[in-house]
């Protein structure tokens, strides 16, 4: 928790302070859907209560609070984009920020089974990295934002971990679950309205391409 606090909370504060001092027009903050935590209300809307289940989720949410404060107090334009489960090229396959698709492919390449936490029925709103990049560009340019708005960046549908594993291979094993939300799903109507954003990534067609590029589908 201490390392996360230094990197996420203090790091964000430093960026906002430097941007304000340097006269930067706008900061687009990479927020996280982990702010929602475990919720029975889906899809998640930006006005929903926050309930982070981890230090990371809590600190990313506090970054949103700081962005809003810098807009109101110091006049720095800010907008916070809550990312939902990003996948795409060059994704991490190990470490704290590794995503499940990359982990599964890496495990199979090593001759290991895909490790599924719990029963695999937990669902995630997988969002293509190219769509996230486009959202950031639009957020930096849109005249409709800049006052500390919080905006979901998610595909707007979700898949179970079992579904993802089945797309990749059939060698899998179930291991002990971890504490995590059973499901995430974004309401992305605010992004469409304020940014003119529309997700275009298709995980069904992307995973086969990724497997081939990684040398798994031979």
Segments and roles (model prediction):
Residues 62, 66, 70, 100, ...:
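Hydrophobic alpha-helix immediately C-terminal to the catalytic Tyr-X-X-X-Lys motif of short-chain
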Residues 71, 109, 140-141, 214:
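Protein kinase-like catalytic domain
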Residues 1-84, 130-133, 197, 213:
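N-terminal Rossmann-like NAD(P)+-binding domain of SDR-like oxidoreductases, especially those catalyzing
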Residues 132, 136, 153, 164, ...:
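Non-catalytic, hydrophobic alpha-helical segments
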Residues 119, 149-151, 159-188:
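C-terminal "lid/loop" region of Rossmann-like NAD(P)-dependent oxidoreductases
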Residues 189, 203-218:
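Amphipathic terminal alpha-helices
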Residues 61, 86-102, 110-112, 116-117, ...:
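Glycine/proline-rich active-site loop of Rossmann-fold NAD(P)-dependent oxidoreductases
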Residues 7-10, 47, 54, 95-99, ...:
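Residue-level signal for the nucleotide or nucleotide-sugar donor/cofactor binding architecture
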């Amino acid at each position: 928790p201490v390392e996360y606090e230094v990197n996420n909370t203090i790091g964000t504060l430093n960026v906002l302070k430097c941007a304000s001092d340097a006269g930067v027009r706008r900061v687009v903050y990479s927020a996280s859907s982990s702010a929602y935590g475990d919720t029975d209300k889906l899809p998640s809307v930006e006005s929903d209560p926050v309930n982070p289940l981890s230090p990371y989720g809590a600190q990313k949410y506090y970054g949103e609070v700081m962005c809003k404060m810098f807009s109101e107090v110091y006049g720095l334009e800010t907008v916070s984009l809550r990312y939902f489960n990003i996948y795409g090229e060059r994704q991490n396959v190990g470490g704290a920020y590794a995503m499940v698709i990359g982990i599964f492919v890496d495990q199979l390449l090593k001759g290991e089974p895909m490790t599924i936490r719990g029963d695999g029925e937990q669902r995630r709103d997988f969002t293509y990295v190219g769509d996230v990049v486009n959202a950031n560009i639009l957020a930096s340019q849109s005249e409709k934002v800049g006052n500390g708005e919080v905006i979901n960046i998610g595909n707007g549908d979700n898949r179970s971990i079992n579904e993802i594993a089945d797309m990749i291979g059939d060698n899998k094993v179930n291991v002990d679950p971890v504490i995590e939300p059973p499901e995430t799903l974004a309401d992305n109507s605010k992004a469409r309205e304020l940014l003119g954003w529309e997700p275009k990534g298709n995980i069904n067609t992307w995973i086969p391409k990724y497997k081939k590029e990684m040398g798994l589908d031979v």
